[in-house]
Amino acid sequence: DAMFLVGETRETPMHVGGINLYTLPDDVDEAEWLNEQLALLRQPQGIRRPFSEVLKLTPLGQYGPIRLEPDRDIDMHYHVRAAALPKPGRYREMFELASRLHSGLLDRTRPLWEITLISGLPNRQIATYTKIHHALMDGAATIHFTNSMLSPDPAERRA
């Protein structure tokens, strides 16, 4: 995992990103739903590792061993964001936004992830763009984690 930190540059970021699309039921108010989801996702209690942990380096910096330690002051408003697409809110604008969000490096003084809820899409759709550093979780683990969060079985869901 340390190699992903050593090899990272502005030109070669070492994070993975993904977009998920969700269609809201007709009887759900989009603005109300978004506000509820933001409030829910921004609650720091119950957030599990590695999302609650911050990178700690030894005196050798990124070339030495790395470890993750609990971030006791995690700023969930920093990690969980909202963005509204300009009208008419096409998928092209969503992908342009995701590209801009993906282009910046993650702040190594904070837990190495961000999620953005994206509104303004057609057909009552909402998107999430998630960015996670590869040192924290690889692509396969990210897919497994996302699938477990979205499971219809509450016993399998975790956040």
Model regions and ranges:
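Non-catalytic N-terminal regions of enzymes
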Residues: 1-159
